[in-house]
A protein has these predicted regions:
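Bacterial N-terminal signal peptides that target proteins for export
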Residues: 1-8
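Conserved hydrophobic positions within beta-strands
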Residues: 37-41
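Extended, charge-rich, solvent-exposed interface segments
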Residues: 119-134
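Short boundary/loop segments of OB/S1/cold-shock single-stranded nucleic-acid-binding domains
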Residues: 21-35
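OB-fold/S1-family single-stranded nucleic acid-binding modules
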Residues: 100-123
């Protein structure tokens, strides 16, 4: 009986280790830098394992560039008060992020001001004039 229990436990541990290692790294983001973009939400994807926000940003030359922003898990964000309707296509957004190291248009979500509501970490410090999200 002991041998069988040990075999079952060993198999379970081996399988759970593979799942833990399958989660990707955030090494592609430069966590020493912060940048802010302003634009219009093209798409908001409330999906596991991470949410994605596509934002169209108009440059000084008038050309629109699409940014892809990776956020936290829907489960974690729901505990912070988010819903799948917190951000919608067409919303005006000011978004703070850690940019991609390679300079591509994208980053890791930090916080945002969306239609007068704040979302994310340390929003009181980053957007002091904005009301807290409900």
């Amino acid at each position: 009986m002991f041998r069988r229990s040990t075999l079952v436990l060993g198999t379970a541990l081996a399988l759970s280790t593979a799942a833990a290692y399958s989660h990707h790294s955030f090494a592609m983001f430069d966590n020493t830098k912060e940048s802010t973009i302003e634009g219009e939400v093209k798409d908001f994807q409330w999906t596991n394992p991470h949410i994605w926000i596509q934002v169209n940003v108009k440059g000084s030359d008038g050309k629109v560039q699409e940014y892809s922003i990776e956020g936290g898990s829907p489960n974690g964000l729901k505990r912070q008060g988010w819903t799948k309707k917190s951000i919608n296509a067409g919303d005006k957004i000011s978004l703070k992020m850690h940019p991609l190291k390679d300079g591509s248009p994208g980053g890791s979500f930090m916080s945002a001001l969306v239609n007068g509501k704040t979302l994310g970490r340390n929003v009181a410090e980053e957007y002091p004039a904005a009301p807290a999200a409900k």
